[in-house]
Amino acid sequence: AWNYSYADAFVILKYTFTNATEDTIQDIYAGIWADPSIANFNYTDIYTPGGGFSWYDNLNGFDETEDDAEFKRDIAYQYDTDGDDGWAESYLGMSALGSNVPYNYLNTNYFQWVWTNSNNSDYPAYSMPLTDEERYDKMSSSVPKGTGPDYTSEGYPAAENSWMFLLSA
């Protein structure tokens, strides 16, 4: 994204929100939805290793750990679980880097769901929002973490699929 080798693998987006009315906005959340589809899109021969539609073997997560300076990472991410035999070893991560609100007070939320799945019977809490009210609910809180063999050690679904995610604050 930049003209320097040390900075060629990221993009920073800056958004400005303006209240065009005299009313005070209450309880606002801003979010960005992503369909990362981590896969090799340049190699599509389905009969060759790494080819075909290979984005149905992805997993998502949300890194809430702190670095050495006690700065929360809050990174939503997706990766290809098997790397498609070397053809799709990439990943994608997104984080809210700041706002007019000091970062210590910025509450970052994370949600995920399967592509086109508004009724996820395997993971009922991980369903796609369909209405404005459902979208607001998803942006105002994080998805509940699960335990057991159906979940990763971080508490997110362990079933590979074409997962979407929503990062909001």
PLM-predicted stretches and their roles:
Residues 26-156:
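Glycine-rich (often Gly-Gly/Gly-Pro-rich) flexible segments and glycine-rich loop motifs
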Residues 8, 23-25:
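A cross-taxa feature marking solvent-exposed loop/turn segments within ectodomains of secreted
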Residues 16-22:
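Asparagine-centered strand-capping/turn motif at beta-strand->loop junctions
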